[in-house]
Amino acid sequence: MGFALVLIFLFGFYLFLMKSSSIFPQRPFTFLYDLWVLLLVLRFLFSLIQILILCLFNFRFVEMTSNNKKKKTELCDLPKCLAPHILSWLPTKTAVTVSLLFMKGWWRSEMKNLSSLKFSFSDDQEEEHFVRFVDQVLRQRGNRKLDSFSLTLNDEIDGGFVTHLVDYPLDNGVEKLKLSIYDIKGNFQLSSRVFSQATLVTLKLATNRSLIWINGDDVAAAHLPCLKTLWLDDVLVADVKVFVRLLSRCPILEELVMIDMKWHNWEACFVVSASLRRLKIVWTDYVEMDEYDRCPQSVLFDTPNVLYLEYTDHIAGQYPLLKFSSLIEAKIRLEMIDEKEEEDEGQEVIVGDNATAFITGITSVRKLYLYANTIQVLHHYFDPPIPEFVYLTHLTIQSDKELGWDAIPELLSKCPHLETLVLEGLFHLATDVCGDVCPCRRNMEQAISYLVKSPVTHLEIYEGVVGKKRGEVTEDAARFGEQVRWFLMRMLHLQQVKIYGQTEDSVTALYDIATELRRLEGKASPNVQISVLQA
């Protein structure tokens, strides 16, 4: 149609020229004939170009289709035994999508044999769709053996549905159960069947606002003969009797993790287990610890086979028993509590007297991490001398610019076999009782040479921020260099010093400090190696 219109236009234009001029007086149609031939040639060339483009496009399409088929074929040609294993590592929703879109035939049927289910509900999902999806997956899977089940709820969902959903893994012999319930609506009570599931190897319960609680009825018939890992995150346990009974029903428990356990109001806090290998009791937020105006009344650890301990708490009123005879590594953060004579209601506030018993109970440790608060506790709440850490070879000390190093001199003197000393920060509150471990002392002539006697061969130092621009030397950088120089001039057995910077800029500034330290004359250990790395 377009070609015809162009032809008519050109013919009309030609007639107009014929009438208005004498360009072609003798052969009036010669020009039109030549134009017609030219247009035919152009038409032919245009068609040829179209054919070439179509051929090229079809070739690429066939090639892409072939590659896609090849990829799908490669995926589908994997051994059948790998299908459920691969899908089990994915969240259930993703596994279903992969199965439907990319897998054919028997691959889809393998969805029924998934050994692991992972469901997660958040505020960007509709409750009705989530419930329908879960029901369809469970209906398709049926009542087959289940290895692992994980449920995470970050938004409100019907409690009755959750109760019904938790029953599914319990009915199918689940071995690893993880329930993270951070929001819910309606009535929800964790089934007591969870604590009598004989097949459970790992049990992790996480919540907030005490949405999950454990009372005496829950553990009355508790029986967890295969449980090796128990994780309680902000779970409310009624009292110490419930907790002790629960642990007693886990005869081969190896790992116990308690996060934000609100046990300050218990009559006592007992952790009794002969099978435990790893024990972690921590608070996730420093502020949360400050919300409590009382310390635990009595804390008891009867855990003779624990190898790793991570413990955060206020100083207890007493420590009647601490069995850590097999301890290898520990991270300790003990907090002091402000002393008060009475509460608003006239009740006495229990305040921990000292940490002597606790520190004495962990002297068999070989690798020890002490938070800055613990250093304060050792100084203010430790009446007799610090006990000797005969087996300690690796010590890490966290520093705080608002807390002193008062306890460090005596602590170093009680580590006769210490090889590696790690200091997380050097800046601390200057006092008169730091001994010779820092140059900020007031009475330097009275200092006892704790550093000179130290057997430490490896010193690792982490700093905060030392200069924001390349080569910039700030007041903190100068103090940092002065403190490191202090160590080098007094520690006789040093073989290696590693300095870690937090940023590229601070590493650059530290390189300049290290260069000066290498040229330093009179070092206590002349052959010490100094290196700077980025943390």
From Swiss-Prot:
Q: Where in the cell is it found?
A: Membrane
Pathway(s) of this molecule: Protein modification; protein ubiquitination
Give TM segment ranges: 3-23, 37-57, 82-102
List keywords of the entry alphabetically.
Answer: Membrane, Transmembrane, Transmembrane helix, Ubl conjugation pathway
Superkingdom to which the source organism belongs: Eukaryota
* Short name of any one Pfam family annotated for the protein: LRR_At5g56370
UniProt keyword Protein biosynthesis present? no
Where's the F-box domain? 73-119
What does the record give as the function of this protein? Answer: Component of SCF(ASK-cullin-F-box) E3 ubiquitin ligase complexes, which may mediate the ubiquitination and subsequent proteasomal degradation of target proteins.
Per its record, how is this protein called by name? F-box protein At1g56610
